[in-house]
């Protein structure tokens, strides 16, 4: 007997190719990358290039070794390498982030079966790997604090590349939502949960809102492979991400790392959330 499984609604009613989705995210990250290069100089540019080369290089090697179709032009390896570079400090040696980019694609992506099959976001998995392998080098020089409105535009206390300009990350995320390349439920529930819970606990939003946090909200948490496909599941997932971010940030005093570790833990339970929020089939019963 052959079974055919269809994912729960909403279903896309127009042609949107994965390649288009990926490249749209890359384009959205370009202004953020440019701001990082402007602020940090050639160190940032070198790390971005090294991370992308590591990701693209290992993709080429793996697909050639196993006689698979080369998919470099779909942009996925480029995107994963770029995203990893943005959540690393500019002081990280280029050879380390090259290894990180290779780890993201070689282990985080292909070891789990390739695009569409991984449990953890590959860039996030690579960030954790780098943090464990070279903990001292991965420590940001500073923790960003928004002391004035101008810090939203250009943050002088940026620790990671993406922390340079939180407003650019926010604008990029909002634009992707407006063009429907990002579904709004996860970012909204994640953002609201984090802000409300942080205020309840008495943490100033200046400590909470950073480029890394917003990148997590709009780009990492919304990764379609590692987040639930159900509408209710996405809301629950966003709430969980926000809750874990604040709990880690509140007790550690570091909302930047809190964001990334919260997303990693949320990735782990995303399949369970999806299972428990599947819509009741017609004539059937909901998942217990």
UniProtKB/Swiss-Prot annotation:
Its EC number is 7.2.1.-. It comes from the Archaea. Keywords: Cell membrane, Electron transport, Flavoprotein, FMN, Membrane, Phosphoprotein, Translocase, Transmembrane, Transmembrane helix, Transport. It is found in: Cell membrane. GO terms for biological process: electron transport chain; transmembrane transport. Pfam families: NQR2_RnfD_RnfE (PF03116). The keyword 4Fe-4S does not apply. One of its GO terms (cellular component) is plasma membrane. The chain crosses the membrane at residues 26-46, 47-67, 80-100, 101-121, 126-146, 159-179, 200-220, 235-255, 256-276. Disruption phenotype: Deletion of the rnf operon abolishes growth on acetate and ferredoxin:heterodisulfide oxidoreductase-coupled Na(+) transport. Its cofactor is FMN. InterPro entries: Ion_transpt_RnfD_Methano, NqrB/RnfD, RnfD_bac. PANTHER family: ELECTRON TRANSPORT COMPLEX PROTEIN RNFD, ION-TRANSLOCATING OXIDOREDUCTASE COMPLEX SUBUNIT D. Part of a membrane-bound complex that couples electron transfer with translocation of ions across the membrane. Catalyzes Na(+) transport, most probably coupled to electron transfer from reduced ferredoxin to methanophenazine and heterodisulfide reductase. Involved in heterodisulfide reduction during methanogenesis from acetate. Belongs to the NqrB/RnfD family. The Rnf complex is probably composed of eight subunits, including RnfA, RnfB, RnfC, RnfD, RnfE and RnfG. NCBIfam families: rnfD_Methano. HAMAP family: RsxD_RnfD. This is Ion-translocating oxidoreductase complex subunit D. The gene is rnfD.
């Amino acid at each position: 007997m052959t079974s055919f499984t269809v994912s729960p609604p909403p279903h896309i009613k127009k042609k949107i190719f994965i390649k288009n989705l990926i490249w749209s995210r890359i384009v959205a990250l370009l202004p953020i990358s440019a701001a990082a290069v402007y602020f940090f100089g050639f160190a940032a540019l070198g790390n971005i290039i090294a991370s992308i080369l590591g990701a693209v290089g290992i993709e080429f090697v793996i697909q050639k070794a196993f006689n698979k179709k080369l998919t470099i032009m779909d942009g996925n390896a480029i995107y994963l390498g770029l995203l990893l570079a943005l959540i690393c400090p500019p002081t990280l040696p280029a050879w380390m982030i090259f290894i990180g980019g290779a780890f993201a694609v070689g282990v985080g992506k292909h070891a789990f079966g390739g695009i569409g099959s991984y449990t953890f976001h590959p860039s996030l998995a690579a960030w954790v790997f780098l943090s464990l392998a070279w903990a001292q080098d991965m420590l940001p020089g500073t923790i960003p604090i928004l002391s004035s409105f101008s810090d939203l535009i250009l943050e002088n206390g940026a620790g990671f590349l993406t922390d340079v300009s939180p407003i650019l990350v926010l604008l990029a995320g909002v634009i992707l939502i407006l063009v429907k390349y990002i579904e709004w439920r996860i970012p909204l529930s994640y953002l609201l949960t984090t802000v409300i819970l942080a205020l309840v606990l008495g943490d100033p939003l200046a400590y909470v809102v950073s480029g890394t946090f917003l990148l997590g909200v709009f780009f990492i948490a919304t990764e379609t492979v590692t987040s639930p496909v159900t509408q209710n599941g996405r809301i629950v997932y966003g709430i969980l991400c926000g809750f874990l971010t604040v709990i880690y940030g509140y007790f550690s005093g570091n909302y930047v790392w809190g964001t990334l570790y919260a997303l990693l833990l949320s990735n782990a339970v995303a399949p369970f959330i999806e299972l428990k929020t599947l819509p009741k089939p017609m004539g059937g019963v909901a998942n217990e």
